[in-house]
Each structure stands twice: as C-alpha cells, then as structure tokens.
Amino acid sequence: MLTGDESLKKRPMKPILNSLETLGISTESDDGKPPITIKGKINGSEINIDGGISSQFISALLIIGPRLENGLTLNVNGNLVSKPYVDLTLAIMKEFGVETNTEIPYEKYSVEHQIYKPTTFTIPSDFSNLALLLAANVLLDDGLEIDINLGEMPQGDEAIIDILEELGVTVILDGDNITTKSPKVLGGGRFDLSNTPDLLPALAILCLKSSKPIEIFNVKHARYKETDRISVISRELKKIGIGVKENDDGMILTPTKNHTPAEFNSENDHRLFMAFSIASMYIGDCTVTDPDSVQVSYPNFIKDMKNCGAQIIPL
C-alpha cells in the first residue's frame, strides 16, 4: 500500500493506475487518490497514458520500463505537459546505462529490457526551488548571492531566468553563483507555463512589485498538484489587494501599490508556503499556515530565510 501526507492524498492518480491495470496489475484506491493498494505481476509490454495531467506518470513508467521482461512501449495520448521533465528523466536514465528509443518525441517511447548500472552522479541545483529564491531576491532588493551547481541536466524551470529578464530583471551568473539586479518596479507580460508549472507560485508573487498585469496561461495541470494551485493562489492574492481574474488554465494578476497584510492559507502545499512566506517578507505583518510542509522539498527554507534577515516567528 502506498500513501502520503494530506496534500499527496489529494493528488489524482487515475491515469497511471489505469496504465498499470493495462499491464495486469490490480489496484485499489480512493477514487484514484492515495492510499493505493497494488497487487499482482506485470505481464504486458505496451500501454497508453494521458499526458495532459502530469508528466510524472510518464517518467515513472519510463523508469520501470527497462526492468520489465519484454521492455515497454509507451504511447502518450493528448498534449503532454511539463515536457522538460520527461527530457530530464531520459537524461538521468542514460547516465545509469539505459537507452530509450524516442519514436515520436513526447508521443511514443520504447525501451528494451536492460539493467541499470551504478555510476557517480552529482545532483544539480533544483531550479524549482531556485526560482523561489530568485523571486525573493527580486522582491527584497537583490541582497542575496546564491551558491548553485547548474550541472548539465536539462531543467525546464531554468526558464525562470528568461521570465525574470522579460520582467526587467538582470540575472547574473558568475561561476557557481547567481544573483539579480532589479529595477524599482517590474514590468508585466504574458507567460506560458505549460512546460514549467512549478514556476507558477514564484511568478505569481512577483506581481507584488510589477507595474503592469501579469497573465499566466496554459497551466491547467497546476490544478492537480498538492492543491489546486490556480485556485489557491488566486484566492490568497486577493486578500492582499491584488486584482485577480482566475481562468481555467491560469490567471491574470493586476498589481496594486497598497498591499494589505493578511493570513495566507497555504493548504499544506510546500511551494505555496514558500511563495506566500516570501510575499509576507515583502508586505510585512502577515501570517502563513503549514510551515511543516517545506519538509517535502526544502527543509532548510525557514532557516535560510532567517539567515537572510527575515523575521519569521512560529505561532
């Protein structure tokens, strides 16, 4: 049986459960959500899966493919979201000695029965979390110099650099350090996050310093994360005075000069807690719920923010 914390129990898993059942596995779940019971032995070699909800399903199936007796042919139906994460999966599999045949990019893959081989692998800095630190740097007057290890793995969330530059920020990469030089007021723009949904929280809070609307679109799959991030971000930013038009696949954020201190409800979502905490540091006198959620991805977040001068007081 597989389960998780309360936020993970909200995540829809039906696409991958349906695929596993195609391979002969029996599954039981709470309407496609954890806890999930898995029984049986895989006896198939070709499956179809919906690519429109999460690329994580495709990554998981690709990773098990080499260990199946007859290998695996994977057909991705619909428009695959978060494509760079599939590229990253394939690159890491190759590092460990597994070759994958990309028959049609982002639509059809096949992998023969193979054995993963031990290797030495340096994990690069995670741009999903780095994006939040860069957003903090922009909002808090560029006081941070962040040590990083970029590595050579493809990371879609590296797009945060292009996004910041479109908003008027200069991003400075100097060896293993990254910092920013920001204008007093940011610009606005339209941003397609179809391949980078984890950038949504970082981009959304940058509207606190913008002078023009920020439109975020093609990120409907962010509704299927630990929370419905489009809905929660829209609701919470309204509390501080941001004009929000929530769309099915994103939002339009209209900035204000006067921000109202508020209590942010992060709904136990680690990325939202971090984003709302950074927004609170900019506004002042705010409260953010669920600090323990950062244990999922960035356990030292609060400590690091305090080291940067943030006044964070547990309640």
Residue ranges, per PLM feature:
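Short, structured segments at the rim of ligand-binding sites
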Residues: 1-315
